[in-house]
Curated annotation (Swiss-Prot):
EC number(s) recorded for this UniProt protein: 4.3.1.17
Protein name (Swiss-Prot/TrEMBL): L-serine dehydratase
GO biological process, one term: isoleucine biosynthetic process
GO-annotated molecular function: L-serine ammonia-lyase activity; pyridoxal phosphate binding; threonine deaminase activity
Protein source organism: Saccharomyces cerevisiae (strain YJM789) (Baker's yeast)
Family matches, as PROSITE patterns: DEHYDRATASE_SER_THR (PS00165)
Amino acid sequence: MEMTHYEKTPLIRQVFNNGKTNSWFYVKHEILQPGGSFKSRGIGHLIRKSNEEALSEGSGKLAVFSSSGGNAGLAAATACRSMALNCSVVVPKTTKPRMVKKIQSAGAKVIIHGDHWGEADEYLRHKLMAQESQHGSKTLYVHPFDNETIWEGHSTIVDEIIEQLKENDISLPRVKALVCSVGGGGLFSGIIKGLDRNHLAEKIPVVAVETAGCDVLNKSLKNGSPVTLEKLTSVATSLASPYIASFAFESFNKYGCKSVVLSDQDVLATCLRYADDYNFIVEPACGASLHLCYHPEILEDILEQKIYEDDIVIIIACGGSCMTYEDLVKASSTLNVS
């Protein structure tokens, strides 16, 4: 049986101890994707579509190249394994050994180069891919987030949510918001694409959650145009992009989306609390969105409306494999999280 590059994930009503007697929250569990995060959708879609095009042109199978210190590289490796493609992933020196092993275990060749993602990416594109092209191979560069075909793949999450709500006899007007974490804007862009395709982009507001220290979207909004962050300091390393995709920035204003910025301390506290409550370990990038489940007053404030008993909010638990429970405890201790 052929492996697929992504799976339909559960949309589960979860009750949070947040002072409300009834839960509004339905959580979409993208941590259950083959690559451990939502990135399996978009990156897998890009690789599959590009490989099919290469085969139809008679170019043979692709050689796939990804630069990522984390979840994008793992998603690329996992997708390539499902299609029997060679995959090379360049990671910076800051990448944790356990993540390197995860990517290797998924069948990819891992090269460690550079002090940050930018240096790893430059080495991948200008050195490794150039060498491979000289050998006559058809190559594919996989950006972690800024690619329209990747957004197309991510947009399937909206189609699934609509289908799952229908299966539970939940009408779409009951959905008052969709919450997702934002780094470079790949997931956000996919959600906007999916909502727009289903004529919902102007009906369901998207709440974009970032952490202070890598809040490039929020800073860009305040600036009135996209900015580039010179330094990324948040513990939510999977959100640490120096820039926001142009489509994400433009869509935010077009569709009346909302921006929330949280502290590292708040997000780490939520990650530990969620692990204790549900036995799910989520990294800070994912915990950022889940934080609003424990603190619905933030959501009501940003939406400028009360959320009532019959209303529903969708939370995208984006997943990620960058931190263990021990990592969360250590980071919490360092930042004096109570």
